[in-house]
């Protein structure tokens, strides 16, 4: 049995969100304020209904509020009804019997039977919210209230104190596990007798008897012979419940025998104590399921990365993924951790964004009707197995850095490190940083943008993750320009070769990638493709050649190259001196730009050194350096789309 679906309406910051869940592990991600904790609390509300002491309730402050614009006058509109609907699937025959008043039956497909429950809170006349519930598919049907006891959960909040919980003298989690073993073995009387025997030995000690006799001597002096008033001494609470709560975990120095002296948990790190607590909880769930196969257990953990370094986060994930193999138990985790997110399969990730929840694997399922084409030369439509393959590729591509795209407001996809270094510097020329707009720059280290795009290109806007996306790529026309016959020396020494190269670039055909990307874009207006004419470096050179040859050296880029490649810059100046006028034609500018482009060091070296030079001389760069227009357009799309 597992929680398969939830719909939350008008609860806290959520107006309406619905999502499906994985039977075992669910990682809920998203930026701050998107509703992750509200989803967890919505689950907790159901699992608290059957508890004698509820750890969570609904107050007037929990009803959703939103701003409404009425002709320029803004007012706050507060809802008066919270409704949360839960659907459970995978019930055993015994569970279907226990939850019979919850069941929605499909007579044709028994395997499609499911349990349904809705809870609601209504606020009237400012009074405390009125709780109500409905089970099954019939209005007004209410299962026996005691059935709510079959929904069991453990909750570890973001600001939890696991150390305190582990060392509590009442109802501590380790004591619960031990008590369960004791009950199963029917050994309560044996354990209580052990304590009674120990108590008898303790009470027979001279230190205890002398203390008792001293008190009685004083009482005799007070009462004389009027009242015979003496005390005895005993140790209270020899019950198993109190005995096991006195058993506390510690960290023994000898890890082989696990006995004798050791460190107190207060001396341990918060992160490691959190792990101990989680291990104990999972042990308790496993033992409870052995005793009773009817309840459903939910373990809800907020921000498990708290106090854990990245490697230990991954160890925790691997442990949780493997340890939660028990039927009838389910994990729900919220996280901001890119480390954790990068290792979790997409089927276990639920992204909260723009007021909706998206189970990420759904972006790669049941999309054949959209007739997606990735290779426009073959014009072959993608089938569901093709999309599943793209999902597997994406899971391999997403590392700690790339997983940050899921938490961003907008995303800039680029080909490589050169673009990453330069564009980060270019934004500073426009007086902002990418992080100011919560934009994530994703270096795909090549041109394999496609697997990422399927997250954001659904034809149905309701299903789409509607983040603004810009893709910056080269159109890579006339790739022969890399050959040695088009080196700087060849071009400057024989202008006919320069003329040929310019003509070849102008008449060159963009690679099919541009058409392919626009095809995969799938008419989604949140995605825009911005291609360079030729390459980024060619565009940088072209944008920084002034129309007037007299101003050639007044440009920030040219001045930089004059320092590192002074001889070549002098040759370009000599080449321009042959022009009949100071104002250059478009063709002359292009040829000068080609020569300037050919003075660049290697691609990576230029990006590394020039980006540093830009950052060190921002004010000078702002005065004369021109950022290629297609780059600015890509950045503008990301800002305007927010």
Predicted feature descriptions by range:
Residues 1-48, 252-401, 420, 615-642:
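Switch/communication elements of ASCE P-loop NTPase nucleotide-binding domains
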Residues 83, 89-190:
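Electropositive, glycine-dotted interaction segments
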Residues 165-169, 176-299:
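Extended helical coiled-coil dimerization/tether regions that scaffold
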Residues 80-84, 113-117, 149-153, 345-348, ...:
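Short glycine-/polar-rich loops that comprise or flank the Walker A/P-loop
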Residues 31, 75-79, 110-112, 146-150, ...:
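Conserved catalytic network of the ASCE P-loop NTPase/AAA+ motor domain
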Residues 48-75, 287-294, 327, 332, ...:
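Flexible phosphate/Mg2+-sensing switch loops adjacent to catalytic phosphate-binding sites
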Residues 41-108:
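Conserved P-loop NTP-binding catalytic core
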Residues 355-642:
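Acidic, divalent-metal-binding catalytic cores of TOPRIM
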């Amino acid at each position: 049995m597992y929680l398969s679906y939830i719909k939350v309406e008008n609860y806290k910051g959520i107006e309406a969100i619905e999502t499906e869940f994985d039977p075992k592990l669910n990682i809920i991600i998203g930026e701050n304020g998107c509703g992750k904790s509200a989803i967890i609390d919505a689950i907790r509300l159901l699992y608290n209904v059957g508890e004698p002491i509820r750890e969570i309730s609904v107050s007037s402050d929990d009803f959703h509020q939103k701003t409404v614009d009425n002709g320029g006058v803004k007012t706050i509109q507060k809802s008066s009804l919270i409704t949360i609907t839960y659907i459970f699937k995978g019930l055993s025959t015994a569970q279907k019997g226990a939850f019979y008043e919850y069941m929605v039956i499909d007579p044709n497909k028994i395997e499609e039977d499911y349990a349904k429950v809705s809870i609601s809170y209504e606020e009237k006349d400012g009074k405390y919210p009125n709780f109500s519930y409905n089970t099954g598919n019939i209005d007004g049907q209410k299962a026996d209230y005691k059935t709510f006891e079959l929904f069991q959960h453990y909750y570890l909040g973001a600001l939890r104190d696991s150390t305190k919980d582990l060392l509590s003298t009442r109802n501590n989690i380790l004591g619960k596990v031990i008590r369960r073993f004791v009950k199963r073995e029917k050994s309560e009387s044996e354990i209580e007798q052990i304590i009674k025997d120990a108590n008898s030995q303790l009470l027979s000690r001279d230190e205890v008897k002398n203390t008792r006799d001293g008190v009685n001597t004083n009482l005799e002096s007070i009462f004389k012979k009027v009242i015979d008033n003496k005390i005895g001494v005993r140790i209270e609470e020899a019950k198993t419940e109190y005995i096991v709560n006195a058993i506390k975990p510690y960290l023994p120095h000898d890890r082989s025998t696990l006995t004798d002296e050791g460190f107190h948990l207060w001396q341990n790190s918060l992160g490691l104590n959190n792990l101990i607590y989680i291990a104990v909880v999972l042990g308790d769930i496993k033992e409870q399921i052995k005793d009773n196969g009817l309840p459903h257990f939910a373990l809800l953990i907020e921000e498990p990365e708290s106090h854990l370094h990245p490697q230990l986060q991954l160890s925790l994930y691997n442990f949780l993924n493997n340890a939660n193999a028990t039927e009838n138990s389910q994990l729900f985790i919220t996280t901001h951790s890119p480390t954790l997110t990068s290792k979790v399969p997409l089927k276990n990730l639920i992204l909260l964004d723009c007021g909706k929840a998206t189970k990420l694997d759904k972006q790669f399922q049941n999309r054949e009707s959209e007739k997606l084409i990735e290779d426009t030369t073959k014009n072959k439509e993608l089938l569901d197995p093709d999309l599943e393959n793209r999902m597997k590729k994406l899971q391999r591509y997403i590392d700690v850095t790339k997983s940050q795209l899921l938490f961003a407001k907008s995303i800039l996809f680029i080909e490589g490190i050169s673009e990453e270094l330069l564009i980060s510097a270019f934004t500073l020329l426009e007086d902002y940083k990418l992080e100011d707009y919560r934009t994530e720059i994703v270096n795909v280290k090549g041109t394999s943008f496609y697997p990422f795009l399927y997250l954001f290109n659904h034809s149905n806007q309701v299903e789409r993750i509607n983040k603004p996306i810009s893709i910056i790529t080269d159109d890579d026309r006339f790739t022969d320009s890399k050959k040695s016959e088009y080196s700087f020396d060849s071009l400057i020494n024989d202008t006919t070769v320069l003329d040929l190269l310019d003509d070849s670039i102008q008449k060159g055909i963009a690679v099919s990638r541009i058409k392919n990307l626009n095809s995969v874009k799938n008419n989604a207006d949140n995605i825009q493709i911005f291609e360079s004419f030729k390459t980024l470096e060619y565009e940088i050179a072209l944008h920084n050649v002034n129309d007037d040859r007299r101003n050639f050296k007044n440009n920030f880029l040219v001045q930089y190259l004059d320092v590192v490649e002074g001889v070549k810059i002098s040759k370009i100046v000599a080449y321009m001196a042959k022009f009949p006028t100071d104002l250059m034609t478009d063709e002359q500018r292009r040829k000068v730009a080609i020569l300037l482009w050919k003075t660049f060091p290697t691609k990576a070296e230029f990006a590394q050194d020039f980006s540093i030079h830009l950052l060190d001389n921002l004010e000078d760069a702002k005065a004369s350096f021109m950022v290629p227009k297609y780059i600015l357009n890509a950045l503008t799309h990301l800002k305007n789309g927010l």
